[in-house]
């Protein structure tokens, strides 16, 4: 419908009366699908007499890019950045803003975890530098929606003892050069060298790929391994210097890094928060 209106000459910068949102704002606020934002931008490219202010802020001060980041839509983030969204004035959304995009049942959720990591990856690839406040917002999302993995989640049932599941994991490709089986056996510090978070996000969106694991009762364990492993580097890198400060720099950074490698993400989160409280 929006595409038809734009083709008929509707002003793409005109805000909807009841929402104070332009069509682009409305798309980005109400959908997480890449093609919806892409439709608007495609029409603007075809009809050069119409000018779209892609960096326009709505009455709440939000740009379309800030909307789709809060909706955990990395595909749409990339579409907007490809078409001129300005990162120099980008404001990372506050924690409550993510409520629009995070629909959680209060447990480990591979879609939310991969969405958070993929959005951050998209922003950083284009030059955005996360602040400590941004990192804390992301960690708080993990805590708020109970995305942290417990050690018990990683232990039972043991999928590696199940021949059919192991065979499936070897055949299931996460990327052109990496199988699910190989990914599950990588160390956390090796993961980001072999797979992008965008690839992880696309895998998480596929309802069919985890169906075999679900039927055999191994989905929860495998998902726990993936979520903990792929988000580990984010938590570890942000906790390294705060932990160093907490111990008053009594160990070299290399030693601190070795210690943190053995911690769970939830432990790293609490360390990060504690360090922030003591420094304030």
Describe the residue ranges of each PLM region.
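Ankyrin repeat (ANK) tandem arrays and their immediately adjacent linkers/low-complexity segments
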Residues: 1-280
């Amino acid at each position: 419908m929006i595409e038809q209106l734009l083709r008929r000459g509707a002003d793409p910068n005109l805000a909807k009366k009841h929402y104070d949102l332009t069509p682009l704002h409305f798309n980005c606020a109400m959908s997480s699908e890449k093609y919806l934002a892409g439709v608007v931008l495609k029409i603007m490219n075809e009809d050069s007499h119409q000018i779209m202010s892609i960096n326009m802020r709505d009455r709440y001060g939000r740009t379309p890019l800030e909307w789709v980041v809060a909706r955990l839509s990395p595909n749409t983030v990339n579409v907007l950045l490809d078409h001129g969204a300005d990162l120099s004035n980008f404001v990372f959304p506050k924690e409550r803003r993510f409520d629009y995009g995070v629909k959680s049942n209060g447990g480990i959720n591979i879609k939310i975890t991969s969405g958070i990591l993929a959005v951050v990856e998209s922003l950083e690839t284009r030059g955005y530098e996360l602040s400590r406040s941004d990192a804390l917002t992301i960690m708080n999302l993990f805590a708020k929606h109970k995305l942290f993995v417990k050690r018990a989640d990683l232990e039972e049932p043991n999928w590696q003892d199940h021949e059919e599941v192991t065979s499936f994991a070897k055949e299931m490709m996460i990327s052109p050069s990496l199988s699910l089986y190989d990914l599950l056996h990588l160390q956390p510090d090796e993961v980001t060298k072999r797979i992008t978070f965008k690839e992880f996000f696309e895998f998480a969106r596929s309802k069919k790929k985890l169906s075999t694991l679900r039927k055999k009762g191994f989905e929860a364990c495998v998902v726990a391994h993936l979520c903990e492993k792929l988000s580990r580097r984010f938590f570890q890198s942000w906790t390294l210097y705060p932990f160093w400060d907490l111990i008053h720099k009594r160990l070299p950074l290399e030693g601190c890094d070795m210690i943190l490698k053995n911690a769970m993400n939830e432990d790293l989160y609490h360390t990060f928060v504690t360090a922030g409280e003591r420094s304030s």
